[in-house]
Amino acid sequence: MKLLNAALLGLFIASTAFTSFSDEKKTATAEHLQNVSVTIRSEGSFSNGEGSGVVFTRKDSKGNLVNFVWTAAHVIDNLRKERKAVINGSPKTIVEFKDPMVVKEIRQGGRTVGRLQMDAEVLKYSDADDGHDLALLRIRKFNFVKDTVTFHLGDEIPNLGDDLLHVGSLLGQMGANSMTDGIYSQHGRLIKSLNKHVFDQTTCTAFPGSSGGGVYKKGNAHYIGMLVRGAGEGFNLIVPVRRMKDYCEEHKIMWALDPKVEMPSEAELKKMPIENTPKEKEDSDAEKEAAKKLFPYMLRVTYPKVLIMKEMKQND
């Protein structure tokens, strides 16, 4: 009897220890994903956009922490401007971007205790309609955060049914990120109306403000894709990290995903084109508008009060 009681006690202690470990891991994962997640705010001339992003941190040659941010291109497309210039006697179209704002909320003891916000420059941009819907930013201040995301860079594709987590800025709540869970419900979705790009599918709940937010494997918190569009509860589309790898390899920026790849110098970064020559458009404008209705962006859009007041006066 004593042996049985001792055995039962041992099982209870082991079970409690396992549960505690699981809870600790869950808490650590949630804290880590909160630390690498940010809100992206874009203040354009006619509208403001609010979405999400994830921080990838590198060290430069001087030991400074350089914080890069991946987000969806459609989150910042209202900041894009073109101007004409004559360079060496030839007319050129110059593409420029106003700085988006990266917002990070500081929480302690279960409550918000402050907020950090920094300007970021746009380093790379591949538009949503005819490109990959990806944007790479660099926060202008060194050492903004020390945390960094880990990308799933292996060749294996996660299995259908794998547990996933998504972190995004609910309704653009400016730095306080919400976490949802779901499963990997499908991969390799080839959607003609979305320029025949491959998307993966998840049941993780998304909301306006989720665009650009990371989707992660629940077991190790590795980033497996970026949430960009939704078509109803339980049906959301992500740009898989393997597509991001293809884009980075094509444009020689694997250093923005893989910490083992040497980071370019400041001079080399300045020479890097923000946009590369887009491929020939395959879809009509009507098809693109239809796609936006079927699979809308998970972006929160607001309008400046001045613009609203002007429209109201015009309608009087």
Where are these regions (language model features)?
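C-terminal cap/linker of serine protease catalytic domains
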Residues: 24-28, 80-106, 171-172, 223-316
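A conserved glycine-rich beta-strand in the N-terminal activation segment of trypsin-fold
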Residues: 25-26, 37-70, 179, 212
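Catalytic-histidine neighborhood of serine endopeptidases
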Residues: 58-127, 242
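Catalytic nucleophile loop of clan PA
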Residues: 54-55, 205-227
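Conserved hydrophobic positions within beta-strands
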Residues: 53-55, 122, 184
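Flexible, gly/ser-rich surface segments that form the specificity/activation loops bordering the active-site cleft
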Residues: 23-28, 124-128, 146-198, 205-211, ...
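A short, Trp-centered hydrophobic/proline-enriched beta-strand micro-motif
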Residues: 31-45, 164, 305
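Bacterial N-terminal signal peptides
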Residues: 7-16
